[in-house]
């Protein structure tokens, strides 16, 4: 009876569609954003008389970014109510076009575990630990960031060397592992690789300094270099680091999680309204990448002429970098360390709640324990992980505007990572203790399952919608493919609504690996209609029995002869139930 009532409801709702134009036109969905097109940028001469055509460097003060997002932005938002609406860069298929921010990778085509484990490192040079002594020249100290480091130049290529600090092997592994997950998901993330090397390879350029997040600038001399190396992992005489290959192009500063870049005419969507940035909260929660401040991003000017990086035309590309905080980064204050991922460092709501309750109510962070099998990962764990409650170090403007459909989009991508993918990527961390690798794989799989169970519950997880050569309308139910819910939960049903008629139930066939197919009906007279006739439009609604909302697929029947069944998918919606 409940099923019949729901069908009757959709019948009444859809009957009203006949008087209006279909919501999706018969045209190919946007699959490539215009921000990848090269633009001409004004040039200027530097002090050496050389032309520089890249946009001006944006400086992002560490203290200001924190103060702005903790104090000033919340106050501004409180007095100027701007409720978050739908993301502004979504195409007709409820997906994202490839852009300078995001490229569809594992979410649009299968990737092997090896491909995921390679990440961005498949392109470009790599360091050789067998190089001669003194051939790795240190030419710059590492500015900002939670972990110590310095820049090295070898054979014309630059690398940022990042070291462990306290939690031996965690930070160096984290940045290499997380970068591969982000890259496979679709973000631009660097080639970060764990490396063991001998001290004699390094040659220090005199007069270098380090600009830390807080405190005074300090010299980078031989003494300080040795002190830094003492904090990182060792295997006999070899030191452990993460080598982060220098990004291509000309660095023009971090990107912001709100607003637009004034000197980039292709940057047309407010960053807080980009689905790729909103939905990035799913990846961050999975990995506990709490340090999502803008200083851990970078934008680069990508000239059309790779031999002249500072020339025009070109475009601005956006990167997520410095992921060493993932998997339980330690803070000096244990009380703050325990809260990371559960509360902002300065959380107005939690402070007020603690004040009212006098701290008598047990919070999730109060239950935190360090697992002896994963001691280097601190409080990174599965118990008490609640996706809706996860928080970064301080408020992130894009994360704060994430809607259910943005989260569902990010979760559909997360679901593509199989256990084999995760094992292959974690193995890149090169842990000395096998228990650490086992713990991290286990925790990632558990947290992934929690995220899938939460965000596949409200909106349909059916993806990869396509029309087969036989004329069937098929998709892949990612919830069933990943065994997110019990097998008995999945009970498929569907209705078809022609633009000019009443809805009818249609048969649904479910196959292995989450496959779902509908045998679409032949419309005998549709071939007589004009190509733009609205009556060629039809709507399929598919429920999987596990998710509250249906998958809504808009099709155009472009049949040109009697007896044909030639549907084209023109739009996809995932409404709430």
Residue ranges of each PLM-predicted region?
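Bacterial N-terminal signal peptides that target proteins for export
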Residues: 1-8
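N-terminal Sec signal peptide cleavage junction
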Residues: 17-19
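C-terminal catalytic region of ATP-dependent kinase domains
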Residues: 24, 28-72, 304-473, 478-482
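Low-complexity, highly charged intrinsically disordered N-terminal segments
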Residues: 73-122
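Conserved ATP-binding subdomain of kinase catalytic cores across diverse folds
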Residues: 123-257, 516-577
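Conserved kinase catalytic-core helix
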Residues: 258-295
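Catalytic-loop signature of eukaryotic-like protein kinases
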Residues: 295-305
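Extended low-complexity, serine/threonine- and proline-enriched intrinsically disordered segments
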Residues: 483-508, 538-543
């Amino acid at each position: 009876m409940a099923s019949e009532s729901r069908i009757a409801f959709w019948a009444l709702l859809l009957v009203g569609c006949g008087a209006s134009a279909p919501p999706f036109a018969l045209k190919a969905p946007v699959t490539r954003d215009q921000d990848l097109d090269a633009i001409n940028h004004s040039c200027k001469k530097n002090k050496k008389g050389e032309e520089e055509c890249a946009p001006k460097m944006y400086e992002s003060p560490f203290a200001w970014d924190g103060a702005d997002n903790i104090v000033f932005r919340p106050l501004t938002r409180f007095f100027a109510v701007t409720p978050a609406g739908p993301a502004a860069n979504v195409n007709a298929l409820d997906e994202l076009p490839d852009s300078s921010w995001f490229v569809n990778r594992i979410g649009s085509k299968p990737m092997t575990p090896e491909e995921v484990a390679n990440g961005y490192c498949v392109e470009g040079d790599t360091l050789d630990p067998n190089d001669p002594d003194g051939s790795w020249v240190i030419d710059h100290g590492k500015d900002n960031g939670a972990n110590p480091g310095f820049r090295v130049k070898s054979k014309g290529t630059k690398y940022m060397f990042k070291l462990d600090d306290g939690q031996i092997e965690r930070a160096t592994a984290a940045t290499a592992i997380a970068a591969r997950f982000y890259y496979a998901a679709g973000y631009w993330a660097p080639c970060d690789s764990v490396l063991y090397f001998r001290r004699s390879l390094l040659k220090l350029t005199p007069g270098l300094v380090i600009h830390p997040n807080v405190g005074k600038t300090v010299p980078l001399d031989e003494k300080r270099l040795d002190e830094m190396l003492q904090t990182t992992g060792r295997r006999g005489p070899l030191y452990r680091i993460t080598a982060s290959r220098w990004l291509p192009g000309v660095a023009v500063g971090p990107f912001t999680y709100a607003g637009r870049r004034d000197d980039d005419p292709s940057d047309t969507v407010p960053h807080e309204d980009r689905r790729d940035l909103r939905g990035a909260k799913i990846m961050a929660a999975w990995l506990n990448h709490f340090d999502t401040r803008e200083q851990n991003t970078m934008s680069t000017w990508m000239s059309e002429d790779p031999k002249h990086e500072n020339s025009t035309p070109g475009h601005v590309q956006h990167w997520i970098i410095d992921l060493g905080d993932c998997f339980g980064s330690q803070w000096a204050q244990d009380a703050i360390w325990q809260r990371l991922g559960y509360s902002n460092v300065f959380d107005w709501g939690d402070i007020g709640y603690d004040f009212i309750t006098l701290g008598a109510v047990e919070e999730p962070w109060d239950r935190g324990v360090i697992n002896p099998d994963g001691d280097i990962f601190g409080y990174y764990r599965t118990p008490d992980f609640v996706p809706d409650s996860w928080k970064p170090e301080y408020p992130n403007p894009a994360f704060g505007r994430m809607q259910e459909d943005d989260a569902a989009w990010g979760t559909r991508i997360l679901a593509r990572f199989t256990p084999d993918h995760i094992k292959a990527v974690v193995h890149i961390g090169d842990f000395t203790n096998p228990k650490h690798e086992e713990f991290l794989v286990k925790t990632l799989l558990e947290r992934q399952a929690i995220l899938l169970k939460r965000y596949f519950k409200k909106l349909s997880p059916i993806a990869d919608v396509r029309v087969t050569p036989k004329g069937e309308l098929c998709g892949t139910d990612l919830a069933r493919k990943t065994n997110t819910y019990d097998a008995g939960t999945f009970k498929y049903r569907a209705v078809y609504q022609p633009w000019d008629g009443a809805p009818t139930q249609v048969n649904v066939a479910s196959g292995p690996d989450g496959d779902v197919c509908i045998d679409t009906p032949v419309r005998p007279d549709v071939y007589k209609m004009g190509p733009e006739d609205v009556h060629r439009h039809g709507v399929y609604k598919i429920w999987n029995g596990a998710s509250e909302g249906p998958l809504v697929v808009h099709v155009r029947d472009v049949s040109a002869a009697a007896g044909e069944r030639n549907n084209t998918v023109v739009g996809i919606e995932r409404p709430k139930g």
